[in-house]
Amino acid sequence: MDFGVVLQTNPPASGVIAMMQRAEEAGFSYGWTWDSHVLWQEPFVIYSRILSATSAMTVGPMVTNPGTRDWSVIASLFATLNDMYGNRTVCGIGRASCRERVYSGV
């Protein structure tokens, strides 16, 4: 059975990276973060550092929003991370609690 951790990408990014390293050392296989262009730091930049600092952990967003992220950029980003670090990324896709949902009252 695999286990994962979920962290917010709160500053400093170095703290998130260190916590993911400790999680891998403790036996966790997955490192997830939230993706918000408003609330936290940019997760995809941090994923590159997490992947560099770990040896086997799979990382990615719990949910990335197709309304706020361009799909061609996301596809290129994941292809590049997988090329650099092996097939160690995963992506949840959905609208989550996005500003569009909040503003539209849905």
Regions found by a protein language model. Name each.
Residues 2-9, 70-104:
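Flexible, glycine-rich active-site loops centered on histidine and acidic residues
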Residues 38, 65-66, 97:
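Positions that flank functional sites
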Residues 58-64, 90, 94:
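A short, GP-enriched loop/loop-strand-helix hinge that lies immediately N-terminal to
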Residues 61-73:
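Structural motif corresponding to the early beta-alpha repeats
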Residues 43, 67, 106:
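Solvent-exposed, flexible loop/coil residues
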Residues 1-62:
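N-terminal beta1-alpha1-beta2 module of alpha/beta enzyme domains
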